């Protein structure tokens, strides 16, 4: 570890790998709410928040587990399709509260083309919430709908490996080849619930 009078100990949340204070400062100074996307191995959280001296105030939030509980989502809760639907849900809730513009906050996630965080931001833009994002970083419509999973499942079915790879989908009563139509069905349920 470094020694000497010029050594500066990083703040606790920076040491823990949770907060980039420089980016957070730049977003707070903008004066706009933040569209926060966080992911774990199993779930995705999307929040719209404003910063206050006493702490952040959450205006609207959505969790990918809500897709299963409220809208009948049968696929995984941490894939590109789930990220899009969770972002759509959070954006519609934020629009109900009067938020029209937000700055993207992807935290310490690397900004890789086609990443889940950009699927959630694309959903917000599609819902009508303005969140700036370069068009080339968002995943394609085919990938968001899960068509790559459906085509992969068809190959596995021919080889007899479908039950091994997609056991969770099959246990939930969803054929992996039907994921694009199931995605559209759940998306329409969300839009109908918020009258859009």
Swiss-Prot record:
Name the GO cellular-component terms: cytosolic large ribosomal subunit
What Pfam family is a match for this entry? Answer: Ribosomal_L5e
InterPro entries given for it?
A: Rbsml_uL18_euk (IPR005485)
Name the UniProt key words of this record, in alphabetical order.
Answer: Ribonucleoprotein, Ribosomal protein, RNA-binding, rRNA-binding
* Taxonomic superkingdom: Archaea
Q: Which GO terms describe its molecular function?
A: 5S rRNA binding; structural constituent of ribosome
Q: Name one GO biological process term.
A: translation
- UniProt subunit comment: Part of the 50S ribosomal subunit. Contacts the 5S and 23S rRNAs.
Family assignment from sequence similarity:
Belongs to the universal ribosomal protein uL18 family.
Give the PANTHER family listed for this entry: LARGE RIBOSOMAL SUBUNIT PROTEIN UL18 (PTHR23410:SF12), RIBOSOMAL PROTEIN L5-RELATED (PTHR23410)
Instruction: Give the function comment from the record.
Output: This is one of the proteins that bind and probably mediate the attachment of the 5S RNA into the large ribosomal subunit, where it forms part of the central protuberance.
Q: What is this protein called?
A: Large ribosomal subunit protein uL18
> From which lineage does this chain's organism come?
Archaea, Thermoproteota, Thermoprotei, Desulfurococcales, Desulfurococcaceae
């Amino acid at each position: 570890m470094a020694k000497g009078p010029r050594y500066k100990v990083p703040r606790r949340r920076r040491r823990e790998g949770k907060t980039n204070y420089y980016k957070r400062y730049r977003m707070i100074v903008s004066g706009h709410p933040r569209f926060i996307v966080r992911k774990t191995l199993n779930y995705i959280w999307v929040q719209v928040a404003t910063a206050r001296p006493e702490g952040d105030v959450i205006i609207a939030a959505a969790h990918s587990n809500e897709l299963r509980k409220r809208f009948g989502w049968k696929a995984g809760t941490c894939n590109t399709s789930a990220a899009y639907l969770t972002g759509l849900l959070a954006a519609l809730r934020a629009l109900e509260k009067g938020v029209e513009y937000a700055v993207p906050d992807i935290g310490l996630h690397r900004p890789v083309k086609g990443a889940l965080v950009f699927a959630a931001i694309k959903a917000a833009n599609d819902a009508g919430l303005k969140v700036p994002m370069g068009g080339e970083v968002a995943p394609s419509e085919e990938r968001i709908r899960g068509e790559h999973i459906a085509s992969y499942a068809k190959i596995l079915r021919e080889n007899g490996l479908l039950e091994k790879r997609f056991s969770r989908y099959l246990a939930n009563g969803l054929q992996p080849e039907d994921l694009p139509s199931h995605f559209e069905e759940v998306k329409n349920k969300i839009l109908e619930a918020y009258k859009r």
